[in-house]
């Protein structure tokens, strides 16, 4: 795929290897459906890469409920300046993630933590969540992980604005401001809808 080659540059061979893992091992392990595997470049790899422009240089990043490693692994491949933690409570998925980062030679800057967000007591510059839960629940899980001055980025679909409206009480309680943003990794890639949460002034 030309767009992915342009976006990932010299890291493209490793991204291709990750795609191979997603479309074989991840499907076999039940971490990705066969239909999703057929759309992995657009729907997953480039969709996750679109977050990059919202992440400051040299950030510490946690991917909450990482599953098969999305969006954490594509971002780690795209951005060597990031230190990425993949947080996943389920043993099977944690094993998959640990084996995958070894295969992709990412062990020096990507770690796997087997835990639920509410059990993990560390803070990060950027907290990521993709297909984990509605925003009103995500706030309670993700905000305690956000360092002072940090941000939460939740990859959402068309329901983003509705989820922000439904989470009004939680946003006020956590003193967070929500912005619905549209970003894309490449002009030929599908747009991604992201809810960015930052501390209110």
Residue ranges and their predicted role:
Residues 1-62, 78, 92-105:
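Class I SAM-dependent transferase core
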Residues 22, 75, 142, 156, ...:
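Residue-level signal for inorganic ion chemistry
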Residues 26, 100-102, 146, 168-171:
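Conserved hydrophobic residues forming the short capping helix/wall of the S-adenosyl-L-methionine
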Residues 67, 131-134, 158:
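Short glycine-rich anion-binding loops that position phosphate/pyrophosphate groups of nucleotides
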Residues 79, 146-148:
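Helix-to-beta-strand junctions that scaffold the AdoMet/dcAdoMet cofactor pocket
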Residues 159-201:
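Active-site capping/gating segments
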